[in-house]
Amino acid sequence: MISRVFKLRMWAPVGVLTSLTYCLHQRRVALAEPGGADQQNPVDRNLLELKMVQVVFRHGARSPLKPLPQEDQQVEWKSQLLEVPPQTQLEYTVTNLAGGPKPHSPFDSQYHETTLKGGMFAGQLTKVGMEQMFALGERLRKNYVEDIPFLSPTFNPLEVFIRSTNIYRNLESTRCLLAGLFQRQKEGPIVIHTDEASSEVLYPNYQYCWNLQKRTRGRRQAASLQPGISEDLKKVKEGMGIASSDEVDFLVLLDNMAAEQVHSLPSCPTLKRFAWMIEQRAVDTALYILQWEDREGLQMAVGPFLHILESNLLKVVDPATPPSKTRKLYLYAAHDVTLMPLLMTLGIFDHKWPPFAVDLTMELYQHRESKEWFVQLYYRGKEQVPKGCPDGLCPLDKFLNTISVYTLSPEKYHMLCSEAQMMGLGNGE
């Protein structure tokens, strides 16, 4: 979870999206007519060819972002937890989206202002987290190198595009994933692309999207006052001896509890006793902030990122796209606060907090005979059925229709984000 995140370029023109979606729909209609391929029948997966894979993942296990208020309830976060496993070591370079110097990371500067009991900084990727990411990389290797000879066994920059939020734990998580995926073998330099904090879209940018900030302002605090959440929070805080005035909600409790559990550190008995309730109430709190019915809010939270994923799909489908403009694999290092709204918009959110090193994988296939396109989603390695799709193997036009409700082009995103600010200026504020 990015601290403060609940507070306060690549793109396809609309005409291109509309025409491609229409063509995909017309092709499906024609194939469903007498003499064509009957889409009511199951698709023969042996006739499907994998064309592209996109993976959105959360970083590995880390130290908490905000310690609990009482020192006797805090565990020790010692520097030994930061040991780098040898198998994860891999050199990489970080640039901005245009290939220039790495931008400044205000989040990392903020984390270094908080020293936890034991000496570690807040939000640091640990050895456990590195091993988790290496294991995820090995799973991807099994899927796309060994089981299906889709990717080269060594890293090839012509096959892989990598983007991460500009936060050190995510950059290092990406390193470990790549080490597992390619067994530390590479044919060219590994470049991880990042963006400025002011224009980052790999997480809901509450700080710089004014309209999103306005819509959600106060919701986190209000969530703790909701019936059920309020009573449960009081019960947990009293059990831990936390004063009612202390700014500790279920998001802070879950952040500490999850970090302690994954590192097998001795959590306080109250956290252990209420573990299930803490996770559920943290999810309830996040859903109160995001709100299913707030379509524009979800659009601003994850719409630009959906647009990037959509654009990658459309570039592969478009026969006019030069091979040099596409990659076989797109990797996006993100956060729990990215995955939650992403899963919501896809209709596959399981009401569980996205754990460390979790992945959402999107595969694009083409039928060898009918030339139709299909999307297959996996979350935590399990097949998913997106909203509006007949089954796990979803016709591309249906999938595009599902995400079109929330997708935002850069122009629309900036326009929607600035609405609250412009209205304020118009009112003389």
Swiss-Prot record:
UniProt entry keywords in alphabetical sequence: Hydrolase, Lipid metabolism, Mitochondrion, Phospholipid metabolism, Transit peptide
EC annotation from Swiss-Prot or TrEMBL: 3.1.3.2
Tissue expression summary: Detected in brain (at protein level).
GO annotation, cellular component aspect: mitochondrion
Pfam family, one: His_Phos_2
GO molecular function terms attached to this record: acid phosphatase activity; lysophosphatidic acid phosphatase activity
Reactions this protein catalyses: a phosphate monoester + H2O = an alcohol + phosphate; 1-(9Z-octadecenoyl)-sn-glycero-3-phosphate + H2O = 1-(9Z-octadecenoyl)-sn-glycerol + phosphate
Domain of life per record: Eukaryota
EC top class named in words: hydrolase
Its job: Hydrolyzes lysophosphatidic acid (LPA) containing a medium length fatty acid chain to the corresponding monoacylglycerol. Has highest activity with lysophosphatidic acid containing myristate (C14:0), monounsaturated oleate (C18:1) or palmitate (C16:0), and lower activity with C18:0 and C6:0 lysophosphatidic acid.
Assembly description: Monomer.
Name by which UniProt lists this protein: Lysophosphatidic acid phosphatase type 6
Native source species: Bos taurus (Bovine)
Organismal lineage: Eukaryota, Metazoa, Chordata, Craniata, Vertebrata
Gene from which the chain derives: ACP6
